[in-house]
Amino acid sequence: HERLVGSEMCIRDSLLVEDAAEAMGATWEGRQCGSYGDYAAVSYNGNKIITGSAGGCLLTNSLEDANQARKWSTQAREAAAWYQNEEVGYNYRMSNVIAGVIRDQYNHLQEHIAEKKAIYNRYKEGLKDLPIKMNPFDETKAEPNYWLSSMLIDEEAMCKQVRGETEALYISETGKSCPTEILDAISSINAEGRPIWKPMHMQPMYRMHEFITVNGSGRAKTNAYI
């Protein structure tokens, strides 16, 4: 957020949309994630710290925009006795049952965070002698919600590997490993794991397009540039 202030985007008076999908309960310098942008999106997917099995919410300080979003999410119906549509709308409204489940969980958010933190610390302690790092954060500024425990393999401990669009190949080396080899190993004992997300600007459908960084325009590396 600090780097955005005075940046090209802010100078051009752009709106800031915050992707706070998995960040509910996390803070940066004491400020809640989801409160930085003009708009923010929070996910209630089944793996999140607060969940309704699906769905999410839109956050904004603008009552006008919030009301417009509510209208669009309920098929953009006008105040008429029949179905009157002057705008394109969608049936995105969350059901009352799911909304009730989600609302009740907020009373237990800090308990959920404490349980996730215990899991994170258990992994951190158990793996401390291996050449890996648990997902890092700035302890002087950030307070995460620990919803996902992930690890980063030290570069010098990585075996040779190459990743295609749907497959990854690697060469086993003594004393070294890679995410694919680790996932194969834990899958063999019926444990769960997965790679973290591939950046959207590197996905095939987007990677030939320009994208915006805090320092201006950018473009993803693709096979076309090798």
Regions found by a protein language model. Give the residues of each.
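Catalytic PLP-binding core of fold-type I/II PLP enzymes
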Residues: S7-E8, R12-G30, S62
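Basic phosphate/pyrophosphate-binding loop/patch that engages nucleotide-derived ligands
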Residues: R12-L15, G52, C57-Q75, T174-S177, ...
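Hydrophobic residues in well-ordered beta-strands that form the structural core
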Residues: L16-E18, V42, T60, P195
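Active-site-adjacent capping/gating segments
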Residues: A23, E29-R31, S35-G37, F137, ...
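Active-site region of PLP-dependent enzymes
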Residues: A23-E29, Y36-M151, H201
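Intrinsically disordered, low-complexity Ser/Thr- and acidic-rich flexible linkers and loops
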Residues: M158-K176
